[in-house]
Structure formats: structure tokens, C-alpha cells
Amino acid sequence: MTKYILSVDGGGIRGIIPAIILAEIEKRTRKPIAQIFDLIAGTSTGGIVVAGLCKKDEQGKPKYSAQDLVDLYQKYGSYIFRSFFLRKAIAWFNGAEYSHKNLEYVLTRYFGEDTLSNTLSNLLLTSYDIDNHCPFFFKNWREDRNLIKLKDALRATTAAPTYFTPKYLKINQINRVLVDGGIFANNPAACGYASGKRLFPNDDITILSIGTGTSERTIKYSSSKRLGKITWVKPLLDVMFGSSLDAVDYQLGEVMGDKYIRIQSQLKIASVEIDNTTAKNIKDLKQEAQMMISDNQRLIEEFCQVVA
């Protein structure tokens, strides 16, 4: 038997791209995403997408469709990444660029007080514990973690350094200071594969991994010589998040062959900035998503026919 794993990358407001692609898959299969996949993994904004698709309603069915998550980005993207000039200026030296309160408001609005146990499928969210120097995974199938509130797990996986403050949680009597899982697994497909092999040891595995778009942006040698400690931060984060995508693609491509399906492309018109929430950029991101669907038409159609 084949088990299907969904993996969704991080990328801030660019999370609208995988949400649109998943809405297309729900439309073609006439099935909710949580019914198609046996394990669903997400990092950062990808965590919001997958958790939204796994959240149960009162009848035990999916609370949100992928289109509902598209609407979330359109309605609340600019609210989450709302800042003021003074805060941005201070953030270069001390503190995060954006207030966590806006993000937490949106997470509470969509996920309430529900815990990881109140989800469908097997859900995996990534984060990194900067206090204990180790990755930390939120897994709804683990009894020692499934009573953590979804909004707290999502606050942790979206705590991108310099953008939002870390999330403090006490879990099983251990103090944890958690930040965005993108610092080690911006594409969480390998994390999903490892968990899938443990959960389904006797089954074949197929992974659908959806990206949020990449950029050609580089750091030229002449520019890098002039960067100081402070101005290195954002470019370094871009390199760190981007390099992990390439590594996972190579590794899973070698191990799984055509059982690893990757939908990703270079952004052609939209901004790569994770906090660019202008109306124009959101419109451009939606257009990028449609181009990704068009460019991967055969892959998507074949996958939908198999799982429908």
C-alpha cells in the first residue's frame, strides 16, 4: 500500500502560493487535503496552511478548505506584517521587526483553543529550540505533545528570526525557546519522510512537496565586503533558508526518485520578500501560483487521478 505525504515550505506571505495549488488539488479530486494525505508536514507559513487543512470542525470534518487559507493570506497578510517606521528602525539594533500580537490574534481567530489532538491525518510542524540547541517537532500522534495548543505550535514554527520574537513554551517540564523551523528545514519533506518511515514501516511512500517560490537574488562579492554584522542578517537568512531547500531536493530525489514530487519555481513577477503584503504583490503571488499550476499541469493531473 502507498502512503501519501504532503510537505509545504516556509515563506511568509508567499504561503498563498501553496494554498492556491492545494485548492486546485481539492477541486480536481473533490476531496479535502486531510483525506488525501496520510501525513502532512509544514514549516513556518507552510505550517499555517497544513494545520488549517487538518483542523477539525464540530462534526470531525475539515474546518477549512484550501481556499479558506487563500482568503486568510489576502485578508490578514498585511495585518500580520504591520509595522511602523520607528519599530523598523529600532529592530535593526534591538527586537523583532513585527509585533507578535497581530500574528497571535490571527492564529487565535482561526485555531482558537484547539490542541494538536483536534486535527485530522498525521500532522508535523517544525521549529528549532534555541535554548536547548535542537530541532523540536510538534507531532499530533505523540501523546506527550498532542495537547499543545495549535496556535502555540504555529506561533513557534512562524517565529522567523528578526521578524518575530521567539515563542516560549514549557513542554513536559522542559523550558523551550522556539523559533521558525525554516532555519534547518524550510522544506520539511525530509522530516516528513523520516516520520513516515517510522509510522508506515511496511508501506511505500510518495511525497508531494510544494514550495513558495525562489529568487535569483544573490550576494555579490563586492557587496558582501561592505556588509557589517547588522546588514548581514537578512541576506544571511535568505541564504540559510534557500540552501536547505536545495539540499532536501537533492537528497529526496536521490533516495525516492519519482516518488518525490516537487512543485516549485523561480518567481518571475512577485517579490521574494516574506513580508511584502502590498495589494500588488499579493496579486502577483496569485499569478505566480497559477503559472506554477500551468507549468506542472501533467504532474498535478497524474497525482490527482491516482488519489481521487
Report each predicted region and the residues it spans.
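Conserved catalytic cores and adjacent C-terminal regulatory segments
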Residues: 1-308
